UniProtKB/Swiss-Prot annotation:
Entry GO terms, CC: extracellular region
Family, similarity comment: Belongs to the frog skin active peptide (FSAP) family. Peroniin subfamily.
Tissues in which the UniProt entry reports expression: Expressed by the skin dorsal glands.
Entry annotated with the keyword ATP-binding: no
Keyword Secreted recorded: yes
Positions of disulphide bridges: none
Subcellular location: Secreted
Modified residues (Glycine amide): 13
Gene Ontology biological process: defense response; positive regulation of smooth muscle contraction
Protein name, UniProt field: Peroniin-1.1a
Keywords: Amidation, Amphibian defense peptide, Secreted
Protein task: Induces contraction of intestinal smooth muscle in isolated guinea pig ileum.
Length: 13
């Protein structure tokens, strides 16, 4: 997801 590139420190991955 694009959000992972912007905020890779979030547990979305």
């Amino acid at each position: 997801d694009a959000q992972e590139k912007r905020q890779p420190w979030l547990p979305f991955g």
